[in-house]
């Protein structure tokens, strides 16, 4: 079996159907004895150039180990699905399991937002304590 990196773009109006599509496409590969090494749903992102007058699309990345026949079947499924705007299948030399730069950047943004949320809630708690102390002294 060979290793492949697969990226496909889904029409932004069909974003709700992406989990089902991922399940269907991974099923095609795993039924033929393939293995999914990495699966990342990057979500809706800006396109570099318009495709069919669309400026955004839903991105999905998969790194798999599969047979050539199952990858051909997957490409056929992409071709017959109108929601898939573009797809790219590249053969790689080895399995890639670490997070992609896109996923790492998203994790960093999420952790930054969480820490900012903690910082914002901390002054609010301190203000509440001061207010309670002031009310007690006023009584």
Swiss-Prot record:
GO terms for molecular function: small ribosomal subunit rRNA binding; structural constituent of ribosome. Residues 104-122 have a biased composition (Basic and acidic residues). GO terms for cellular component: cytosolic small ribosomal subunit. InterPro entries: Ribosomal_bS6, Ribosomal_bS6_sf, Ribosomal_S6_plastid/chlpt, Transl_elong_EF1B/ribsomal_bS6. GO terms for biological process: translation. Keywords: Ribonucleoprotein, Ribosomal protein, RNA-binding, rRNA-binding. Pfam families: Ribosomal_S6. Residues 96-139 are annotated as: Disordered. Signal peptide: none annotated. Belongs to the bacterial ribosomal protein bS6 family. Binds together with bS18 to 16S ribosomal RNA. HAMAP family: Ribosomal_bS6 (MF_00360). This is Small ribosomal subunit protein bS6. It comes from Shewanella woodyi (strain ATCC 51908 / MS32). The gene is rpsF.
């Amino acid at each position: 079996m060979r290793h492949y990196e697969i990226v496909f773009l889904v029409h932004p109006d069909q974003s709700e159907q992406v989990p089902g599509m991922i399940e269907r496409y991974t099923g095609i590969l795993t039924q033929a004895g393939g293995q999914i090494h990495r699966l990342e749903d990057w979500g809706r992102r800006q396109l570099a150039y318009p495709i069919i007058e669309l400026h955004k699309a839903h991105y999905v990345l998969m790194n798999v180990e599969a047979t050539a026949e199952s990858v051909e079947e997957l490409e056929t499924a992409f071709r017959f699905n109108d929601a898939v705007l573009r797809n790219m299948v590249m053969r790689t030399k080895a399995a890639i399991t670490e997070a992609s730069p896109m996923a790492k950047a998203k994790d960093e943004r999420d952790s930054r937002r969480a820490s900012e949320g903690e910082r914002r809630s901390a002054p609010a708690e301190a203000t509440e304590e001061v207010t309670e102390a002031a009310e007690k002294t006023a009584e």
